[in-house]
């Protein structure tokens, strides 16, 4: 392998492989070898290669046989030196993109290998510009305008949007390649009759064969291969046409733009149609030509009888100023089965562009403003009543560029109506002239999918794909018939609409879920508030019922009166002590608070002397007389514990009394009234100083 070479940097290879996972490792290593492991050069080269692998535009034969949904047919001008009939890789010009979902065309079995099968993306158009937003929305979720055009480049230097994604083996043509998309829809039974346009002069190096097929009648747009009307296997061999077209007999000069030279365009005559055979039989087709003039050597147009109601085409096509009108002629059962006597293809030049249209059937932006000579063609044969079309009965010129103007001319001797209708009586003796006029169409807004004149707000809803066109008679529901066009424009537009609607559905579902959660939260909050209200009501009811009885009220009134008496006695005692003066008070005499406490190890012993105890007993007697003048029951209670408490303490602590006399008397704190040891200078409880 290439990555095993010594000059390859494995770290750079891994970085590039991680940056571009869609590109195979051998391709990345080969790119590194070609660029001498230059990271910038490899990054630029792999960025260009990444588009091909992301959108599957590389030419893989095995995958092409299985996954091909598009038919690229190169049309246009290419130098004779690079034109080889046996190698499809050397064919240059304008690639023709055609949907071939119902079957498969094997490019290896075609005589000239002029078919390049490219798988079609499932969610994007076949040709997408670099600055194109496929969801039709900008950041503000509005219909975004047409993307700004790129700067104008030289005709021989710039490449189109499709060329940027073409395989590397494709030679860049001298003239800009313009994509052509052919979209056909089945509208009738398959009849093995084809219209062939074959020139009469040989060896034209500027021609390219065109092979156009179209899905079967039963196909609703995208089907599997078991419903195809022709063999999907590689055994489906194309008829052998001459890939080298002859030089034309007559020329008609045409000029499309100031930067483009006049290239001759010829008028062709076709041999009898019965002489050409085709393995494909498909209904009504519509071919489109591009604005870059070129020689078309073979045009394979297989029309068949159409079952479309005549009223779909009875309305005259809308006139456009300074150009031909666009008309559709379905092949009816009354048309001539014999050969077409004359087929004329003319190219008209337009002097002044027409008014700007306001609709586009496809979301593809081909950047037509890059070069003045580039005018991509994008014409669809989808029914006008298709959901992607806004006007039910009026076909209009589509994408900016050169639409295909098909005009059917019948001699006046024919008994049929000369107006475009599906029922035209013809006979083999009457010569028929089938004219194909190609002219320039006015530029239109690319992203205006909805017709402004009829549907200014919302597009018509997408009908189910299973609604196929039915035979005549149902004139009232033809507007809702889903066209079974399998072109990339309808498919990409439908997929984009479905994606957009799916996103809207998900967003609405998310909003609905959020609203449901909000509703549940509000319900829970309301339930909680109701519960609190009920609890308050219950408490209020219980409080009103718990009224005390008269006996309880009498007891409470007696307790309240007793408490008031005790408060009054305490207040009078305080007043009496204040009247005697705080300086005369003996701290030891007021130590009855500590005497009434239960004895414990932390409580200091009582150090009152006998004389002090006598003085204290006298003061207590006087206080008891003054306080208990109103309450007669208190003196026995107060006298008994005091006499009982003082006696035992004085008898039980003779030795601690001597020790304390030796150390000094304890002092009482003025702030907390705590009796402290005489050796302490600060209160043991509140840390207040002894002498203030």
Curated annotation (Swiss-Prot):
Residues 409-422 have a biased composition (Low complexity). Gene3D superfamilies: DNA helicase RuvA subunit, C-terminal domain, Zn-finger domain of Sec23/24. Residues 215-230, 249-298, 349-387 have a biased composition (Polar residues). GO terms for cellular component: extracellular exosome. Pfam families: CUE. Residues 496-580 form a coiled coil. InterPro entries: CUE, TAB2/3_CUE, Znf_RanBP2, Znf_RanBP2_sf. Residues 138-159, 206-333, 349-427, 598-662 are annotated as: Disordered. Residues 608-620 have a biased composition (Basic and acidic residues). The keyword Coiled coil applies. Residues 8-51 form the CUE domain. A zinc finger (RanBP2-type) spans 662-692. PANTHER family: TGF-BETA-ACTIVATED KINASE 1 AND MAP3K7-BINDING PROTEIN 3 (PTHR46253:SF3), TGF-BETA-ACTIVATED KINASE 1 AND MAP3K7-BINDING PROTEIN TAB (PTHR46253). This is Mitogen-activated protein kinase kinase kinase 7-interacting protein 3 homolog. It comes from Xenopus laevis. The lineage of its organism: Eukaryota, Metazoa, Chordata, Craniata, Vertebrata.
